[in-house]
Amino acid sequence: MAQITAAQVKELRDRTQVGMMDAKKALVAADGDMDKAIDVLREKGLAKAAKKSGNIAAEGLAEIAVNGNTAAIIEVNSETDFVASNDQFKDYVNNVAAAIAANKPADLEAAKATKMSDGQTVDEGAIALTTVIGEKISLRRFQVVEKTDNEHFGKYLHNGGQIAALTVIEGADDDTAKDVAMHVAAINPEYLDRTKVPAEELKHQTDIFTEETKNEGKPEKIVPRIVEGRVNKWLGEISLVDQEFVKDPDQTVAKYVAAKGGKVKGFVRYEVGEGIEKKQENFADEVMDQIKG
C-alpha cells in the first residue's frame, strides 16, 4: 500500500474541495493515484468536478501572427514574469511568431532553426537575448494553422499574452471569429464538438456517472436515463460549439456563429506554462536537513 502524504491530501482537497478525511480515504482506496482518487470521490458524489493541477513554473508570453491564410500560435518561456514584460522580450516573441507564420516549420527543431527578419535564427535570437537579460529564453511550442479564402482567423490575447486563442470560422466575418476566440480564451473548451471526444474518455465518464447515480439510490430502471442526461450535460460543457456563448449565454457558440452566417472549424488555445509542473519546496524538511547537517 502506498504511503499517503499530507501534501497529497492537500492537493486532492485543493482540486476537489472535499474534506480532509474524505480526501485521505480516497487516496488510500486509489493507492495514492491522484486521478483515481478523484474518480473515487466523483463516484461517491463527493466531488462533481476536479480542477486541473495548477502547478506552473514557467513565465513568458504566447503570441499569434497571421500571414495571409496561415497563422502561427506560439509560446516563448522566460524564468520570471518581470522578463516577460520586457520590451526586448516582447519584440523577440513577435519576431518569432512572424517567422513561423511565414516559414511554416514542421517541428520544434526546424522552428528554432528558422530565420527571423533580423537574420538570426529563432535559437540564435534566444541565446542573444539570454545573454542580455540574464535569464534562459526558449521557444516552448508552436502550431501552424491554415485556412481557405472563405474562412476567417480570430485571434485574442488575454493579459498581454498570458493566454492566446486562435479560431478558424467558415463564412461569417473577422469580428465573429474574434468573438469566438475571446470565448475560447475565457472558457477553455477541451474539444471542438462532441464527435472529437475520444471514445475511451466518453466511456470513462459514463462509467463514473453510472456509479455516481447508483450510489445516490436511484431506481435501477431510470439510471440509464439519468446517466444519459449527465453525459449530455458534460459533453455540452467541454465542447466549444455546444457551450453557452460567453457574451450571450442564451445561445450556444454554434448558434451565435450560425446567426452570422458561419460555422466554427477549429481552435487552438495556449496558456503560458500550462502542463509544466513546478517543484514544490518543503521548507520544513529543508530546515530539518540544515539542523541535521
From Swiss-Prot:
Belongs to the EF-Ts family. NCBIfam families: tsf (TIGR00116). InterPro entries: EF-Ts_dimer_sf (IPR036402), Transl_elong_EFTs/EF1B (IPR001816), Transl_elong_EFTs/EF1B_dimer (IPR014039), Transl_elong_Ts_CS (IPR018101), UBA-like_sf (IPR009060). It is found in: Cytoplasm. Keywords: Cytoplasm, Elongation factor, Protein biosynthesis. Its main location: cytoplasm. This is Elongation factor Ts. The lineage of its organism: Bacteria, Bacillati, Bacillota, Bacilli, Lactobacillales. Residues 80-83 are annotated as: Involved in Mg(2+) ion dislocation from EF-Tu. The gene is tsf. Associates with the EF-Tu.GDP complex and induces the exchange of GDP to GTP. It remains bound to the aminoacyl-tRNA.EF-Tu.GTP complex up to the GTP hydrolysis stage on the ribosome. One of its GO terms (molecular function) is translation elongation factor activity. GO terms for cellular component: cytoplasm.
